[in-house]
Amino acid sequence: MITVIIPTYQPGAYLWKCLDSLESQTMEKHLYEVIIILNGCRNPYYEDIIRHIGKYSMNVRVEQTDVPGVSNARNMGLDISQGEQVCFVDDDDWVSEEYLQQLYSSVQDTGFISVSNVAAIDETSGETRPDYLSSVYQSLHHHKTIGLLKARRLLSSSCCKMIPKEIIGKDRFNVRLSRGEDALFMAQISSRVKGVALADTKAVYFRLLRTGSASRSDKSLKRACGDFLLQEYSFLKVYLSDIRHYNHVFFWGRFLAVFKGTIIKYLCH
């Protein structure tokens, strides 16, 4: 079985589009379950979700926690999941009809994570925009499988993937991080990853690009520095916890990526 985990906080109509895309999967309904984790405020969202999912034939359930945060919600989903494979989907994103089937079919061996194509959709215009993950996938998808180092650029996000539960093990998302929690989680589990399988292009993860901007102020600079230090410390702590089994080049690449990402985000705001 495959478990799809969707964390959501005060959801809008976009959640219905996400759920509709999972109901429309070509994969047989008994082969996957969908777990919605409503985090933060319960009302009126919980009852709205219950009413909406009543029309579906897929196996879907909703759980609620008063503790806000995507990491805590994902961890809660992992703890109650029944599937041998796990997919994370953000509540404002959606997937193609063959998403689950193609991801599942692409796995040739145990210890492999399967990765899908990605399409970034502009929230305002509805147009497809250039996307980092999409460009990396397009440059590599002619390979059936690739090694950890070659796949490192794809492993900055936990979405657009199918991850075996045996690879995840007891690892969970770091609830202290407000940025970079995906990349840290993928780095944590990397010691058990033999390689990455590239799914057929029919497996597409549609990522909604939301509009918005932040002011470039002393406060934002302090926040950026704080986030940077916490991320680097978290990566270093994970790396040192099992230094013999982690790939050194992979982790040092992550340290550099955090630094580079912090500089770019600050300069762009």
Question: Each PLM stretch: what is its role?
Answer:
Residues T65-S81:
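Glycine-rich, basic loop-to-helix element that forms the pyrophosphate-binding segment
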